[in-house]
Amino acid sequence: MSVGTGGEYWKDKGLPSVFKHELLKRYLPQFGGMTGSHSQDGRVVYLDGYAGEGRYENGDAASAEIALRVSSHFRAKRGLTLECFFTEPQQKSFEKLNRVVEHYRAGGVPAHAHRGEVDGVLDGVIQKAVGAPLFLFLDPCGLVLPQDRLVGVLAQQRPQKKPATELLMNFSMMAVWRLGGHVRSPKGNEKSLQRFDDVCGGTWWREYFAEAAAPGARDGAAEDAIEAVAAEYARRLARRTGMFVQSVPVSHAPHKRAVYRLVFATRSPYGLWVFGDSVARARDAWWQTLELQEEQNDPDALFSTVSILRPDPEVVAKEAVPAMAANLEQLLRAGRAVKLVDHTLELFGAYYGQVTEPAARNAVKYLHGEGKTSTTGVGGAKTRALIVHPARP
């Protein structure tokens, strides 16, 4: 069960929410467009399982209104239907959410708000999504649904590639830290530990913190255990569902540990490609917002934190191109043509989620300039659809 959010949360967006909502705003329209154009009646289903109030007090759109705006745009401009379902257990938050939803419903947007926990409506939404693509957005302030429940949805109820099913969820690093303390303490709360066992799909996570609490454990072992648990959670979800799973850290400030990770799951190589591009663009918005906040808080400062700590995007992109070209060269050594979108992670390597799509085309051009591919990278299909051939003998 999510613990909910207090009133301070809804005044305006914190930096983690800036990243999360920018990512959702960029990716959801592309998911809807990619899958809806091939679905029955052009219909896509979206579930926001922890919708909160839907809108911040300063008027900024939260996750619910972001989805409603996408749905409104699809209806007006693209002839697609994004049917939205929202759940929120807290009465006051639900009342505000419902007002936002009703405003869009009055304009013809197919949207439904339910007061209660997401687990109580999940199966009903899945039934509504039969024959249609489904996107699940689960963003609790606390613990997410048990992994067995998620696996049941992704691997049993929705195991097929088409219509597509995708998941974007918040895996709380703060909750892992708090519950890891129960493992390390002789007075730990066993009920809380069992609840997190359910979230993780087993007791395996406890071992990481038991090792961190052992005599002679090095400094920082507990902090590293949090990261290890998050990484293993994503690996297990991928193995149990057969999906591509990526885990993106989200923090309050540069060089700080993540407060949560956004875990993304898809069966589509196109989804994996577009998500990486969306992450890179959301990361840029995060830095821009931080810089704006610093300017507002201290307009007379000579230097901002951003100017000192932010990696120059142009430098990162410039460094990425030869590294990605080398990755592509390695793929071509098999002697067969390579369709870029089918090798997203191999192509981008460490730069996945760090650089945007144009870096991939530039890598093709770079490799062509070295005489290692006959494909020029100029013109033609969308970058993701480029087919790159080995150099002619």
Regions found by a protein language model. Name each.
Residues 343:
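Non-catalytic DNA-recognition/assembly elements of restriction-modification systems
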Residues 1-340, 348-393:
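Class I S-adenosyl-L-methionine-dependent methyltransferase catalytic core
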